[in-house]
Swiss-Prot record:
Keywords: Chloroplast, Plastid, Ribonucleoprotein, Ribosomal protein, RNA-binding, rRNA-binding. Part of the 50S ribosomal subunit; contacts the 5S rRNA. PANTHER family: 39S RIBOSOMAL PROTEIN L18, MITOCHONDRIAL, LARGE RIBOSOMAL SUBUNIT PROTEIN UL18M. GO terms for molecular function: 5S rRNA binding; structural constituent of ribosome. Binds 5S rRNA, forms part of the central protuberance of the 50S subunit. Belongs to the universal ribosomal protein uL18 family. Its main location: plastid. It is found in: Plastid, Chloroplast. One of its GO terms (biological process) is translation. This is Large ribosomal subunit protein uL18c.
Length: 120
């Protein structure tokens, strides 16, 4: 049976998740990139709860971006997520790229979060 690209991404993500785990002191920043939008959330894996989330679907962000699927949208999502997490007292995180390459929209989100004050 031939493995398609979605199954390959899921396999990569599982392999990374074996090594990356978020805690209360250093939660996991998880990024999911679809064809239309980008989603990011800060997760405490021990409790199994999402602490902070942001996405390009958010109505406040949609007014400032033209497309939800470009690097500009990813930068605004990263900046928004960092502002929300710092407001909650979360600065140090572990970055989980979700099986995607650290390139393009994923990289833009990560760099914007770093510039806004997050450490990973």
């Amino acid at each position: 049976m031939k493995i398609n690209s979605k199954q390959t991404r899921i396999h990569k993500h599982r392999r990374v998740r074996k090594k990356v785990q978020g805690t209360a002191s250093r939660p996991r920043l998880c990024v999911f990139r679809s064809n239309k939008h980008i989603y990011a959330q800060v997760i405490d894996d021990i409790k199994g709860i999402t602490l902070v989330a942001a996405s390009s679907i958010n109505l406040k962000l949609q007014s400032s971006i033209t497309l939800g699927s470009n690097c500009e949208a990813s930068r605004s999502v990263g900046k928004t997520l960092a502002e929300r997490s710092i407001k909650e007292g979360i600065e140090n995180v572990v970055f989980d790229r979700g099986g995607k390459l650290y390139h393009g929209r994923v990289e833009a989100l990560a760099e914007a979060a770093k510039e806004a004050g997050m450490v990973f």
